[in-house]
């Protein structure tokens, strides 16, 4: 049987509506949604090698800058040596494993092994990063080829192709300054002036390098560097670097805002003064149908007490499903919500009922001190707790009061176009919410405690009550046992008594029966004598009477 399309749509729409968050009922208890965004997850990253050439090519001004270059090399050594020693300490203890096949002459690469005995103490993160470091390291031949290429180049950004067709980007942050300013000014400036200018520039560049790699001195193996921080060492032009790296993803801005592009140190050359980095720039995958909602709450008054509804700050919806959302590994951008891992996890059925419109399922807690929002702007309307803050109509100068039977006040242009609340002047729009929410028209959820001290106190009281209840239960069990024992004993006594009475009764009845039988026999003997009387001469009437 075919179902008409209109009937099918009519049947489907209610199901879809119940699966969404009921913003209307939530707004009655002070919960509103401030934003909604798509959900994207970071997928597998692509890697690109980048070389920071710390020593610029100064062939054209070498005679005037020997002193400054010597001091600059000494400063670089204080940064590079600790990093190089830490990298060597773990990479020299990681060796490849060769797996033998059936033929002894053929072996294949199977993985790497960490010499733990030689390494000593290392955390799990350091071990994992060390193995990844070993896999991304260049061999000695590639290092020598890279050194030769860096010596000859005098460009700020240089693309160096290795024998395996791998492109390595070499960057020098001071080279443009030398090429464009110092070299053309050699004829107008003295040699001392050129040296001083280069010295100041190198000192500033060293400061940027120190601020960039300084945090990595403690743990250079597992430390990560953001591309934003790296841009200072690359001359400040981050767009030029990203274009040279070949990244042209549509989510570039979102990845930059979420700091998704990371760099790790893979090699340090103390003699040639350069650092090799492995840059990972990920791609994003949008999870279709998942919407992340941000929630904000406004306090409301019940009599003299101020409450607010306890809901998570972020939730996610996908069709009928509503789930919690962990915003810790996420970045929020205009392009959407970007997470480095799955941030969705199940929500309790009671909280789901709350979001679907059952206000009695929404827990509430008392406002402590001045913490908590007392007004918020949503859909152009001002939702305010005018019982706790001063609400004033700026247009008329009158005070907007909130009756005791109201928990919130909704102010729109039909009531007051310009509102002053808590010292802030706000122009509101046309009405989107009812003018007020009355206490008798809404079911409120159970009160709970969120403060650590209050939670501890409540738990202590609950434990005390449980102990008392346990003692009372033990006492009641003892009483029941005694009552049960007493009832059994009394019943036995009663049965024995009844039995004795029955036996005595039977004996008495038996004796009575025997006595009655004896009496009846005696009377029979009296009434029937052995000799008959002489009735001779007696009249017939007398005899007949006898």
From Swiss-Prot:
Predominant location category: virion
Disulfide bonds: 354-362, 386-391, 393-416
Gene Ontology CC: one annotated term: virion membrane
Post-translational modification remark: The inactive precursor F0 is glycosylated and proteolytically cleaved into F1 and F2 to be functionally active. The cleavage is mediated by cellular proteases during the transport and maturation of the polypeptide.
Record key words, sorted: Cleavage on pair of basic residues, Coiled coil, Disulfide bond, Fusion of virus membrane with host cell membrane, Fusion of virus membrane with host membrane, Glycoprotein, Host cell membrane, Host membrane, Membrane, Signal, Transmembrane, Transmembrane helix, Viral envelope protein, Viral penetration into host cytoplasm, Virion, Virus entry into host cell
Residues glycosylated per entry: 25, 57, 63
Coiled coil, from the record: 134-162, 458-483
Topology versus the membrane: Single-pass type I membrane protein; Single-pass membrane protein
Name listed for the protein in its UniProt record: Fusion glycoprotein F0
Lineage: Viruses, Riboviria, Orthornavirae, Negarnaviricota, Haploviricotina
